C-alpha cells in the first residue's frame, strides 16, 4: 500500500439537520414508527451523529453488502444540537435513533442514566479499545454502555501563509519550537498580532479553554465527585483565557457559531488547537483557502479533546440489530476508513500499526504526515482529566462565562462570580 491521503468534505452548516441516506431506506429509527423486520423488508437502523465521524462511505459499504439491515445516518452540526435532542427524547421515552453518538465529555452523565441504554458488554471485544477509553464507557456495575469511535489527541493547526506574513517560521518543526509551553504560545501570538493587525492569533476563547482544561487533572470535581470549581488550576486557566481576550489574541467568537465558521474564509485567525477529528472540520470550513498546515506540537505537552461513543438506547425497536451495527462501525477496520475520510484518529490500538495510519498524509494541510503526528501526540498525553457526572454541565457554565467576557457583557471578575453562582445552582 502506498501513502494514504486523507480526503475532505465540506462540513455541514452548524445547527443544520441533515439526514444522509445510503442505499434503500425504508424506515425511521427507534421512535416506534419504523418498519422492517417483517414480510421480508429490511430493518433500518438509524445512527445519530454530529460534526464529522467519517461514516458516509462506511454506511454505503454496509448497505451495498447487506439486504436484511440498512443504515441511515442522522447528522447534526454540533454536539450541543445532538445533546438537546438526546435529553428531550430520553425524557419523552421515545424518538431517539437506534444508535446515538455521545461526545466523550458527556459519558459520565450517560452512565448515570439507569436503564436508558443497552448493555453492550461483549467478552469477544475485550482489548479492542485503549484501557482508559473503555473505562470511560463502563459504569460502576461493570456494564459497557458505549463503543468508542475515535480519540482526540491534539496538535496545532496553523496558517503558514499568515505566519510568513508576520515574519514567523513556517516549517512544521520550526513552528513546533515556537509553542512548546503556553507562555511561548501566547508570547508568539502577541508578536503575531502586532505584525498582522486584524487577524487574531487563535480561533476562539472557548476552544483555547477546552485545550487547557484537557491538561488539568481535576478541573471541576474531585475524585469522589465533590464539586470544586475554586481550585488554583481552574482559576489559572480562567485568568489565561480571559487575560488574552483583553490582549486581543482571540477572535472573541463562539466555537461552532456561524461567525466562527465564516472566519475561516476571512483570515480571521492564524492557529487553533486541533484533535484529529477537527482536521475535517477545518478543511470543510476553510475550503478553497490555501496555507493550512499541522504541527507536531501542543503547548504544555499533550492533550486529548473529545472522542465519541456509540450507544444503543433501550427505547429502540431493533436493539439487537443496532448492537450489531455499532460493533461493526467501531471495529478497527472501519475506524481506519473513517480516519482516511475525516482524520478521526481510532481509539482501537490494533489500528495503529496499519499502513493507512502510519503513512497517512493530508493534502489540505500541505501533505502533513497526520498519521505519524497524531500517533506521536498520543504518546505525549500524560493527564486524563477526571470527569464526574456534573462535568458536562459545569463545562457548559464555564464556556458561557467565557462568552460573556468575549461579548463584553461582563468583565472577567463579574463573569467568574456569575460562573460560581451558576455552578452552585446545579446542586
What residue spans do the PLM features occupy?
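C-terminal capping/gating helix-and-loop segments adjacent to ligand/active sites or protein-protein/ligand interfaces
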Residues: 366-422
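Short helix-initiation/N-cap motifs at beta->coil->alpha
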Residues: 75-86, 103-106, 178-184, 252-266
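Extracytoplasmic/periplasmic substrate-recognition and gating elements
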Residues: 247, 284-345
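Hinge/lid segment of periplasmic solute-binding proteins
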Residues: 103-155, 293-294, 362
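Early extracytoplasmic/lumenal segment of secretory-pathway proteins
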Residues: 42-44, 49-106
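Short, low-complexity disordered leader/linker segments with a strong preference
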Residues: 1-44, 421-427
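Immediate post-signal peptide segment of exported/extracytoplasmic ligand-binding proteins
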Residues: 32-45, 63-69, 141-143, 186, ...
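Glycine-centered hinge/linker elements that transmit conformational signals in sensory
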Residues: 186-190, 224-254
Amino acid at each position: 500500500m502506498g501513502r494514504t491521503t486523507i480526503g475532505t468534505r465540506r462540513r455541514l452548516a452548524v445547527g443544520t439537520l441533515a439526514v444522509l441516506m445510503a442505499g434503500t431506506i425504508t424506515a425511521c429509527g427507534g421512535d416506534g414508527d419504523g418498519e422492517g423486520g417483517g414480510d421480508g423488508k429490511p430493518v433500518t437502523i438509524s445512527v445519530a451523529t454530529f460534526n464529522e465521524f467519517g461514516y458516509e462511505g462506511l454506511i454505503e459499504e454496509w448497505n451495498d453488502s447487506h439486504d436484511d439491515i440498512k443504515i441511515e445516518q442522522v447528522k447534526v452540526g454540533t454536539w450541543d444540537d445532538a445533546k438537546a435532542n438526546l435529553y428531550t427524547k430520553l425524557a419523552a421515552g421515545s424518538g431517539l435513533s437506534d444508535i446515538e453518538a455521545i461526545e466523550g465529555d458527556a459519558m459520565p452523565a450517560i452512565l448515570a442514566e439507569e436503564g436508558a441504554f443497552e448493555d453492550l458488554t461483549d467478552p469477544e471485544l475485550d482489548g479492542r479499545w485503549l484501557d482508559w477509553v473503555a473505562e470511560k464507557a463502563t459504569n460502576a456495575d461493570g456494564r459497557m454502555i458505549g463503543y468508542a469511535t475515535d480519540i482526540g489527541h491534539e496538535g496545532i493547526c496553523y496558517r503558514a501563509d499568515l505566519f510568513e506574513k508576520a515574519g514567523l517560521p513556517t516549517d512544521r518543526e520550526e513552528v513546533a519550537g515556537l509553542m512548546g509551553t503556553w507562555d511561548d504560545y501566547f508570547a508568539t501570538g502577541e508578536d503575531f498580532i502586532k505584525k498582522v493587525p486584524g487577524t487574531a492569533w487563535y480561533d476562539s476563547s472557548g476552544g483555547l479553554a477546552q485545550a487547557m482544561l484537557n491538561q488539568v487533572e481535576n478541573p471541576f470535581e474531585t475524585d469522589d465527585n465533590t464539586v470544586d470549581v475554586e481550585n488554583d488550576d481552574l482559576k489559572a486557566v480562567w485568568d489565561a483565557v480571559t487575560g488574552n481576550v483583553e490582549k486581543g489574541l482571540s477572535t472573541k467568537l463562539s466555537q461552532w457559531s456561524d461567525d466562527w465558521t465564516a472566519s475561516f474564509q476571512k483570515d480571521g485567525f492564524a492557529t487553533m488547537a486541533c484533535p484529529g477529528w477537527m482536521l475535517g472540520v477545518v478543511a470543510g470550513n476553510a475550503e478553497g483557502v490555501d496555507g493550512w498546515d499541522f504541527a507536531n506540537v501542543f503547548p504544555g505537552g499533550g492533550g486529548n479533546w473529545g472522542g465519541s461513543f456509540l450507544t444503543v438506547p433501550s427505547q429502540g425497536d431493533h436493539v439487537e440489530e443496532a448492537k450489531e451495527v455499532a460493533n461493526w462501525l467501531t471495529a478497527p477496520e472501519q475506524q481506519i476508513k473513517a480516519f482516511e475520510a475525516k482524520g478521526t484518529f481510532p481509539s482501537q490500538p490494533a489500528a495503529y500499526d496499519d499502513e493507512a495510519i502510519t503513512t497517512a498524509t493530508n493534502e489540505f494541510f500541505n501533505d502533513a504526515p497526520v498519521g505519524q503526528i497524531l500517533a506521536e501526540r498520543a504518546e505525549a498525553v500524560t493527564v486524563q482529566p477526571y470527569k464526574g457526572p456534573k462535568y458536562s454541565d459545569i463545562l457548559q457554565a464555564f464556556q458561557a462565562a467565557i462568552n460573556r467576557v468575549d461579548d463584553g457583557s461582563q468583565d472577567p471578575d463579574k463573569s467568574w462570580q456569575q460562573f460560581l453562582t451558576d455552578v452552585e445552582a446545579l446542586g
